[in-house]
């Protein structure tokens, strides 16, 4: 399939030598896709492998659930015009496509990575991510103590972790369903690798361990940044979208720090020449006139324009060096190396960290969401049969306790799971279930898949009482 991309001004332009081509061994899938192979061999393929990946992501259940997952604040509790994880994803995709087009990278690959990059995110944003990682790694002292007292089990020894980029890949290779010939969505490696590396591979300096991912050589985990130009572009686009749009949402959502944020943005105008904004612009007047979107748009436009100039320079230098490998790419040309020296963006990041994330409303909501998720986890650990049947049926497939697996098979019910064990058998095997890393991972998968509203409803079903 030809390596060209359609440009908005109506011409076709071949991909840059550093862009990831649409054909080659790198686009092979784990499971052979007979339909795709047949169409390519017959010369009737209407989509590139990366377009197929993009379409599969869009039609996945995990993608649809993003609409009710938090970006920064609770969805449904504040201004409904505030971004969710889904709208953030679409905006990252738009920025990534825009940058890819300008540097002649593979737009389809950039879009596929962008659309899938947050599929593994938890309810309640990064708070949910921290709750699950603290639980699995043993940093949650309360849950760790409970497990030690009830089951004489130190979860720290399991060396399990949770991080949303790893979980996104797990969703795509293991958890999504709907195809008869393979598990997951059977995506190409450049898409999965770009999703995995759109953010850091460590948590607080500690490497993240995920079974089925760390040992996969195709992900090149010895290299912290993406092996494709397009993956690096998505990491850049994610940072730009997150920082700039979080600031806009804080103003639109009328955070208590809104006034301080406006003062900081006013100072920003004095420090930097921003395209289409004069030095005499009054930020408060723009907010009052509901023109903050235009203000943020001008800032994003400037950050992108200057980032593209830097990326082009890096690409030109690399092309001159005679580098032949298009994939995997072992040079960082479009991620932190671009944004780290971008003074305007770094000032925006300071504003986000100091006055958006560090905020009275957000702190209260984070406390609430942390409490809800910890209580849900405690309930499942107290009695695993409180998990729904589809999770328990999955556990039957992956259970790593041989005697228990045999006992379940002998139950005779279809489909079989631990719910149908006798009371005595369940009590005997419950400690082994809780200590089974396969169970702990599946339980975390289920909690991570919840939307904000579903998690709140689950808490109420488990504990009763008033709406929390």
Where are these regions (language model features)?
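Broad structural signal for hydrophobic residues in well-ordered alpha-helices, predominantly aliphatic
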Residues: 99-100, 132
